[in-house]
């Protein structure tokens, strides 16, 4: 897969009322708000534009101090981050063919090369959306519901995403929780690329049963019959920050750099 740089913009959905870590975007990481860390990582990619989409004035005010980062004040009724970014795309006035990379607001260590790679993957595929995955080699990750797993077809497209360990090894997991060489098991990296036009189509899709059960917005795309291209990336993506424990680990990782 070519990793040539293609034009793209980065949009970061950010909401204050995260259930597992309230006020997450403004939590301090290395003495600075988490949203600052994520936005500056986006700026380092060479993106044409970087936007933060939020419905909270506290987040908007925090981002306003960052040079080169735009803020879109969005409605507080959106069901998912992608719905929020669709409104951001309208506010920004992006043409339908503009490649939009959805960088989650809890990914302060996302490698710039990986962000560029997901844009390139969309450009070179016939899928409606592109995303990244990395292999799982730790049992604690495989069975952690906060780490999303996925399975792909032989064409490198997603078949399903789940918080459960998929595929389930019927013979092995009955007696042990250790991954086996029959994998690889894949961890989904919460990084997406699609064009601005598809973002608008996404808002017309009704959340399906699978999305509601798993609480995973990408399942809406699959349930509606669209395709998601997947690249297994060699770049190291630390897990996102979802809990106070994750934040403590991120703080330690920052200190060790």
Curated annotation (Swiss-Prot):
It catalyses: 3-deoxy-alpha-D-manno-oct-2-ulosonate + CTP = CMP-3-deoxy-beta-D-manno-octulosonate + diphosphate. Keywords: Cytoplasm, Lipopolysaccharide biosynthesis, Nucleotidyltransferase, Transferase. GO terms for molecular function: 3-deoxy-manno-octulosonate cytidylyltransferase activity. Its main location: cytoplasm. Pathway: Nucleotide-sugar biosynthesis; CMP-3-deoxy-D-manno-octulosonate biosynthesis; CMP-3-deoxy-D-manno-octulosonate from 3-deoxy-D-manno-octulosonate and CTP: step 1/1; Bacterial outer membrane biogenesis; lipopolysaccharide biosynthesis. Activates KDO (a required 8-carbon sugar) for incorporation into bacterial lipopolysaccharide in Gram-negative bacteria. NCBIfam families: kdsB, PRK05450.1-5. Belongs to the KdsB family. This is 3-deoxy-manno-octulosonate cytidylyltransferase. It comes from Xylella fastidiosa (strain M23). The gene is kdsB.
